[in-house]
Amino acid sequence: MADSPWDEIREKFQTALALSRVELHKNPEKEPYKSKYSARALLEEVKALLGPAPEDEDERPQADDSLGAGEHALGLPAELVEAEGPVAQGAVRRAVIEFHLGVNHIDTEELSAGEEHLVKCLRLLRKYRLSHDCVSLYIQAQNNLGILWSEREEIETAQAYLESSEALYNQYMKEIGSPPLDPTEHFLPEEEKLPEQERSKRFEKVYTHNLYYLAQVYQHMEMFEKAAHYCHSTLKRQLEHNAYHPMEWAINAATLSQFYINKQCFMEARHCLSAANVIFGQIGKIRTTEDTTEAEGDVPELYHQRKGEIARCWIKYCLTLMQNAQLSMQDNIGELDLDKQSELRALRKKELDEEESVRKKAVQFGTGELCDAISAVEEKVSYLRPLDFEEARELFLTGQHYVFEAKEFFQIDGYVTDHIEVVQDHSALFKVLAFFETDMERRCKMHKRRIAMLEPLIVDLNPQYYLLVNRQIQFEIAHAYYDMMDLKVAIADKLRDPDSHIVKKINNLNKSALKYYQLFLDSLRDPNKVFPEHIGEDVLRPAMLAKFRVARLYGKIITADPKKELENLATSLEHYKFIVDYCEKHPEAAQEIEVELELSKEMVSLLPTKMERFRTKMALT
């Protein structure tokens, strides 16, 4: 039993905190918030025992307390007023209770009541917010209001609260700097107060949470550069203070890598992914940190899913780096330009010379052993654009390793879309590797591998439910056959007298490419099988490319039958004319296929003459 009212207050408060920490699944199934409601009742009792705060006789916040009116919400510099004396101490303790009541109501999904308590907490602390006793509590209350408004999708309001917290932290650290009181200490006897080191740890954790929430807000506002900066700061601080959930940390680092990949900052992307691998490897091996949930390591499915997701980020890294190199070295018909390759080789030395200075500016996670472990992963994967087949092959093999890892979880049974995307990435890795290969027969084999992995996908896919995916795969298979046919034609051109086997092979590849391009084009038809007069913007370019390639394919069919050849030329002309006519009616389409349109116009001009000569020749024979 408590010996005095103050002992009773402290006892009730500590019991309320303990009840607040009880996880929902430990409550009765029909009363998931039982412990929260019990904690709330005790907090209300403590509030009653403390009595009303001066100038706060249960009045509602005034109009000037709303966000944007009070300077507390704008992050303006605060004046230092210490919370000294019984009046100030009473207000602070009341604010602690209002804060916990606010969080309690939010936890039980009573957001308006939660907001009211948190705003009241801020109001009680406003003039003391820069003080050693109150700054941590004030920042935590603002952080919670930031989250609350973010969940309501009032992002600018959330931003104001969170930026105010950041400004207050920075002002406090600059002007005062000593570790402030943790809110729980207001109800602890002097001998149980926290040591400076623990206070510092808790305060830094509060600030880390602030940065984490700001990163999410900036992401939501599409301020991607700022979001990445805050995400990196959060991850770095979590490692420094050893306060992180390995699975969550690794996923956040892998997600951050995608920002750097899109910015073509491959060194930074590689560092994030390497750190993700190392930290993910800690699951089940390290001492549980304060932020780690009990579920850590206990959910095999989630573990394998996250592992697969990180693997997919690695695939994106390898694929984008290879594609970036291809774009830098290809000529206007998509083949390797040796002059561009030589120029990039000359630039490589400069890139390597600048590596150390770039590295100093780049994102860096961890120190000591952790840093060494991350570096060991980094050293196995290049961040430089590959300049030849051997360099491209190294990246390809890394990407393929992660394809197999991703497919372990993302299987066709249960994860149809994800599985297909992974297979498409695998195909894309082969496609870009083929660009670096100089041997045409080996290039053919790479495209053959692509077809072998893509064709089985559409056999089991219901086009009614997976129309877009079906179209993507049909187009990709068609293009792979198209590329193989071009390569076989190039090989045949080098032979003095191509045999019938090669001719048959070319025609079969041609036929397969036509089949899949036609399947793609047929998928654009309406229920009455009529091709649209106006092609949707999302499929305009692929539809025009398909028409162009179908036209070209008919012109490439090898036949000894003059009548058949004339029919093929007529079909080819029909498709070229479609492109020209469509672009005349829809000028916006011309911008999508400028090169193909010019070639189509040429063919529309040339083919009739060629066909007429052919008819004359046929008549003579």
UniProtKB/Swiss-Prot annotation:
Gene3D superfamilies: Tetratricopeptide repeat domain (1.25.40.10). One of its GO terms (biological process) is central nervous system projection neuron axonogenesis. The modification Phosphoserine is found at residue 178. GO terms for cellular component: cytoskeleton; mitochondrion. One of its GO terms (molecular function) is protein sequestering activity. Activator of KIF1B plus-end-directed microtubule motor activity. Required for organization of axonal microtubules, and axonal outgrowth and maintenance during peripheral and central nervous system development. Interacts with KIF1B; positively regulates KIF1B microtubule motor activity. Interacts with STMN2. This is KIF-binding protein. It comes from Bos taurus (Bovine).
